[in-house]
Amino acid sequence: MRILVLNSGSSSIKFQLFEMQTKTSLASGLVEQIGSSSSRAVLKANGEIYEIKRFIKDHHDGLEAMNELFTTSHTLHDLSELDGIGHRIVHGGESFFSSMIVDESVIKKIEEISPLAPLHNPGHLAGIKNAMKESKNVPHVVVFDTVFHQSMPEYAYRYALPYDVCKTHHIRKYGFHGTSHRYVCKQAAKMLGIEFDKFNAISLHLGNGASACAVQNGKSIDTSMGLSPLEGLIMGTRSGDMDPAVVIYLLNIGVLKWNEIDNFLNKKSGLFGICGSSDMREVVAKMQNDERAKLAFEMFCYRVKKYIGSYYAILGRVDALIFTGGIGENAPNTRQKICDDLKHLGIHINHELNFSNERGERCIDEDGAKIKTLIIPTNEELEIAIETARVIKERTL
């Protein structure tokens, strides 16, 4: 069974082809800067790199360029050879509680909730519509970042704002990185020999975007991101949790204008706002001689530690603390700082294992630690492919 995974943005298409029997990637690539004179398409397969440099007008042209690369690399001759195509969708709102086969009603619902994710869902829709034209007889499946968090109880996802306003306008905590949290938790449960529906964990997806998730009996019961990915942990350029009155104050004194709020909170804040760099590698490298870099690092780790304590309290029993994402997988200094002084919770990492150059899934806790501390590289594309295959198989039963 071969599944193609598409992640279509406003000006890009990321793609990966999987053989599901072995769960291996046959090819991966990117169409970027769609609509620009510098647009191009790149594919990696069989240890080779294939590239097309030409003007790519829109998503239709982008998919044609992808098809050309598949043909040139002899990995796929036509999309009709596929068993399914899985599409990543950032926001499913309150309309979707599981991955779905795409039909007109699904497309209409995604269009209706696009105001909740104006930067992402329109690009996803463009990719879906054009891919369906190119492969009419292949089943298409949508996999939502928000679905894993639909198991949160109302007292966890509801904001303490006027109830009727929130209900009418679908204002609530949705959470994101759900595909990543689900994948790494499944892998961790398998690694520890625990049935997933009995597995409790605190999952930390730490990258330029960052979120924490409390998982109880294999289900998300709370997560740090909210209506948008802005809430929660400090991120590369996003503020995370803050007092909303700060924005009101800055508007009142004329420092901010209404049309500058989004850019201020999403692009100019976080690590970048504190020390001028959004890259944790640069922050760590500058810490010794730069007080603001040191402050940014300490603020980031402190915020994560607060969420660990909070989620420990609501879970009661924690089988594993999981690190994933670019920072979670590759920044031992950050992991060490986050886990320092958590021995009273049963979290105790081994210094040598934490700083080891070993890669892949691994335990980094001390022998006898009550809670296993794991590094699990995320693979959202594979999880989307697995979900796509599952939905297609269930439809044929």
Swiss-Prot record:
Q: Give an example GO biological process.
A: acetyl-CoA biosynthetic process
Describe the task this protein carries out: Catalyzes the formation of acetyl phosphate from acetate and ATP. Can also catalyze the reverse reaction.
Q: What is the lineage of its organism?
A: Bacteria, Pseudomonadati, Campylobacterota, Epsilonproteobacteria, Campylobacterales
Q: What class of enzyme is it?
A: transferase
Question: What family classification does the UniProt entry report for this protein?
Answer: Belongs to the acetokinase family.
GO CC annotations on file = cytoplasm
Cofactor details (free text): Mg(2+). Can also accept Mn(2+).
Which named protein is this?
Answer: Acetate kinase
What are the binding positions for substrate in this chain? R88
Q: How does it assemble?
A: Homodimer.
List of catalytic residues: D145 (proton donor/acceptor)
Please give the InterPro entries that the UniProt record associates with this protein.
Ac/propionate_kinase (IPR004372), Aliphatic_acid_kin_short-chain (IPR000890), Aliphatic_acid_kinase_CS (IPR023865), ATPase_NBD (IPR043129)
**Main subcellular location:** cytoplasm
